[in-house]
């Protein structure tokens, strides 16, 4: 399999490094000749160019990975797919549902694989958390919540919802196993007028499940945590932990046998199952290569990526409408 990587800023070189272990990185593309020279040295077999057209005109190129600015994702992904190349595009898929639908349609019409780089869905800890839910070990899931907090980086072109929320929405949808029908969001702009630095989100699902997100780049803590509260047990995935990334709490309420129908708190064992120490990006890139080879639908395929954009767009509407509930 021959693949080209487009965009050699912060993330693109990581994609090139991982894909080079799985396939032939045949092209590197970036608007900066200096970046091409610097990163091309690590991939001596790759041709370099400042024009995407050169990749699309290469009849022997199988796939293109896009790590370009968010505002270019949809347009470039559609071009790649229309040129009948398989496409890996970093998250989010698009900046609007309308854009995302065009990309998904291009993938369907071309018969090519479209995969969105929702990296956390490929983290072994998130996969183990999903297995805890699906196995019933946690009981009936009551609610989910996530915190993605840090001090910085302030972005002039997008708010905390769009900058940080794609990570958490993709994971919460995977853990929930369903799509929300309604959401609300409230945010505040402290550092830049009209650009929310902190956002609180609430998602409601058809099954009765609820999920909450706290997103902020104006916080003293660096936190990347997901919590699942079940009727039998509770569990957290904390990506900032080096050793105990996944923790299961045998905590909850047991109904007493008194005639008053009271509930008694239960605080049992706390366990930390071992999470395999494999780089999520390596797993993600391997998944893309395998789906190109077998023609299967990726875990974070076009439709899944579109679902994330649909939720983000609904949350943005709620932000703009004074936290009014917005249908998804």
Regions found by a protein language model. Give the residues of each.
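Hydrophobic residues in well-ordered beta-strands that form the structural core
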Residues: 50, 89, 114-116, 145, ...
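C-terminal glycine/acidic-rich active-site capping loop/insertion
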Residues: 119, 232-300, 324-328
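A contiguous active-site-proximal alpha/beta segment in oxidoreductase catalytic domains
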Residues: 71, 94-156
């Amino acid at each position: 399999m021959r693949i080209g990587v487009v965009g050699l800023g912060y993330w693109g070189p990581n994609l090139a490094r991982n894909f080079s272990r799985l396939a032939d990185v045949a092209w590197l593309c970036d608007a900066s000749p200096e970046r091409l020279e610097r990163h091309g040295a690590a991939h001596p077999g790759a041709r370099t160019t400042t024009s995407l057209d050169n990749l699309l005109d290469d009849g022997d190129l199988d796939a293109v990975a896009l790590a370009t600015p968010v505002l270019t994702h949809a347009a470039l992904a559609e071009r790649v797919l229309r040129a009948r190349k398989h496409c890996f595009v970093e998250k989010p898929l698009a900046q609007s549902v309308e854009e995302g639908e065009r990309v998904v349609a291009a993938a369907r019409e071309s018969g090519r694989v479209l995969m969105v780089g929702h990296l956390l869905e490929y983290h072994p800890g998130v996969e183990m958390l999903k297995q805890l839910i699906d196995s019933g070990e946690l009981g009936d899931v009551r609610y989910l919540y996530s915190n993605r907090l840090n001090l910085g980086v302030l972005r002039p072109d997008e708010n905390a919802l769009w900058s940080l929320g794609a990570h958490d929405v993709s994971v919460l949808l995977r853990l929930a196993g369903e799509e929300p029908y309604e959401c609300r969001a409230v945010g505040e702009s402290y550092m830049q007028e009209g650009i929310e630095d902190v956002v609180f989100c609430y998602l409601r699902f058809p099954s009765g499940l609820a999920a909450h997100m706290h997103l902020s780049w104006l916080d003293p803590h660096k936190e990347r945590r997901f919590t699942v509260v079940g009727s039998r047990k509770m569990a957290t995935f904390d990506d900032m932990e080096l050793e105990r990334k996944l923790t299961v709490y045998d905590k909850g309420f047991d109904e007493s046998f008194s005639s008053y129908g009271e509930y008694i708190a239960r605080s049992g064992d706390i366990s930390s199952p071992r999470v395999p120490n494999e780089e999520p990006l390596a797993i993600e890139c391997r998944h893309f290569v395998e789906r190109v080879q077998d023609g299967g639908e990726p875990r974070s395929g076009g439709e899944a990526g579109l679902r994330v954009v649909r939720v983000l767009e609904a949350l943005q509407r709620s932000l703009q409408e004074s936290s009014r509930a917005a249908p998804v």
